[in-house]
A protein has these predicted regions:
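Charge-rich, low-complexity N-terminal segments
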Residues: 1-160
Length: 160
């Protein structure tokens, strides 16, 4: 569900970095948690009510760790600017030295592939257009719904 995805994204530094590390403190401070954006709220077009949310993950080439705070500040700022210019709702972003996660509300007519590629291209500007990310990325939709495919007490539903 949305709450689980957003919590996971916001907690990347806690999940991946040692508790007493300076890197954990840095990446925790860099995380984006935007309380003004609520991806559980329906958005509207002229003909429909919708929830179109994406969880996107970009991994650095060969998981190369980037620890320069200025680069990560640039990435965070570019994510914010890109989401504003695309009229996307950036609710969370979590960073660790070798990858980043973020959650967005998008328009239902947009392709998740096109959205991911557009952010990958925007973020390349922070790295002087160097190809710093793996040539693929993870993208998934999420929302408030739960199809009940996995019941918490009984596990996966039987296949019939």
């Amino acid at each position: 569900t949305r709450e689980k995805v957003e919590s996971y994204v916001a907690g990347q530094a806690t999940h991946h970095l040692a508790e007493d590390s300076a890197m954990r403190a840095l990446f925790s401070d860099l995380a984006v948690v935007n309380p003004d954006i609520n991806l559980s709220t329906a958005r509207f077009t002229a003909h429909a009510r919708y929830w179109a949310n994406l969880h996107v993950v970009f991994v650095h080439n060969w998981r190369q760790a980037i620890t320069d705070p200025e680069i990560w500040i640039g990435i965070r700022n570019m994510l914010r600017r890109a989401s504003q210019s695309k009229v996307h709702l950036l609710s969370r972003a979590g960073f660790v030295p070798d990858h980043l996660h973020f959650t967005l509300g998008i328009h239902p007519g947009e392709s998740p592939l096109d959205v991911g590629l557009s952010y990958m291209n925007n973020l390349a500007w922070v790295h002087n257009l160097e190809p710093i990310f793996m040539p693929s990325f993870y993208v998934a939709t999420f929302g408030e719904y739960d199809l009940g495919a996995i019941h918490p007490a009984t596990g996966p539903a039987p296949v019939v």
